[in-house]
């Protein structure tokens, strides 16, 4: 049955590829047809579809589908987490930010990295010991199942939806530039492949797609950085001096402070990036794919190492682009601007240091990056619906594995259709605020509930519900009333909320709400929930009673 379904999906994909071929000869303004990129892209897709077929034969149970049976090693999971987290926005966006702003780009990239020590020291071990498939398992461990799982699932789905839209729109624009494909074709293609990986291969296929993508991206970025350093005699001093001579801003690119207009926005952005990371459902879900808490800690250790190394490379790549791309008229259009915009700086650098073949490789890696991220997001969204809402809220924990998996796969299909539709709908919208909003909601709803449920004995369901919903709604409302939506999209003269990011205030609302409505909860249920903290604490520390990986 699975093989027939995959063949059907393959046949559905063929007209899209044919349509893509037609599109290549049509609306191609910025990037010419790159045969190497197309060939490498097809090789990657073929390889990952084979992995999906292999994974589908090993995915028999609910545990296999959600967590790959808990049999992923710490090292493999670390690579997969890095593959899940290092998006095309990280690779192209941060190197472009360094290309335009210099040192500020490095500061911005650190925002994505500093959340990981929090996950390593405060969350990973306890999350693995207490949970099974989703972070809602942890949040609802000693609290009322229905309301907490409903809140956690809503928080997860909102974050997944916003992040997914941003990735799909980014994917369409990126592929349009890299391959010359029509935007709508690119979005449909990403959506179909995303559904295939997750529906048939589950977490096992998603994990290996992310691992392969991480290895390819790290290899490509390393090669680019080495070639940049080779061009300046492996001297950072020479790299920075020559970059200052070439860049329009001169020595100002070595100074911080030009990125954010005021300290409140800077603090709010930093808090959102730092604590939002610890509340992203597709990242937290990865800790259940390993056998125990020790492997979960190893996962974060390896992931942080890989990502730290990667963000260091983007800094070199950005300065390399200043040196080798900005001064080369071959990469400029008639107006003197970079062909394809500043986000193409890393792609042009690949051409400059490795020629057409390496340009094709990096283009294919950029596409692989998108597929790996959207696959992880889709699985997280599907598990929130099937495991948290359907199995535990609607069926009160009495759903069969077969029914739960059926609901999960239907959800994957629905998410695929929704992602494609919204990706097309939001084609011409500014999607930067969606990523910021996704991190802000994760920091304002998911993170406070997870961290407080694990560490504070006085938490009650009432406090978690009121504080969690208050944080989520505050983040959304402040984002709507802020400069990005209220002024730039809705067209009002001035914003009601003057800052770009809401996390500073929405997190405060969430934590105060959780604290106040918990300590004022005198109900008998609240007393029982507090009394259950000791048993939760023992399990979170020792792992006694924690779910284990299955052996195949």
Swiss-Prot record:
Gene that this polypeptide is encoded by: actP
Membrane-protein topology: Multi-pass membrane protein
BP GO annotations: plasma membrane acetate transport; sodium ion transport
GO molecular function: acetate transmembrane transporter activity; glycolate transmembrane transporter activity; symporter activity
Subcellular location: Cell inner membrane
Record's function text: Transports acetate.
Disulfide bonds: none
Record-stated family: Belongs to the sodium:solute symporter (SSF) (TC 2.A.21) family.
Any single Gene Ontology cellular-component annotation: plasma membrane
PROSITE patterns: NA_SOLUT_SYMP_1, NA_SOLUT_SYMP_2, NA_SOLUT_SYMP_3
Transmembrane regions: 35-57, 78-100, 105-127, 148-170, 185-207, 214-236, 266-288, 301-323, 364-386, 407-426, 431-453, 465-487, 497-519
CDD domains: SLC5sbd_u4
Family matches, as HAMAP family: Acet_symport_ActP (MF_01426)
UniProt keyword terms in alphabetical order: Cell inner membrane, Cell membrane, Ion transport, Membrane, Sodium, Sodium transport, Symport, Transmembrane, Transmembrane helix, Transport
Domain of life: Bacteria
InterPro entries: Cation/Ac_symporter_ActP, Na/Glc_symporter_sf, Na/solute_symporter, Na/solute_symporter_CS, Sodium:Solute_Symporter
Protein name as it appears in the record: Cation/acetate symporter ActP
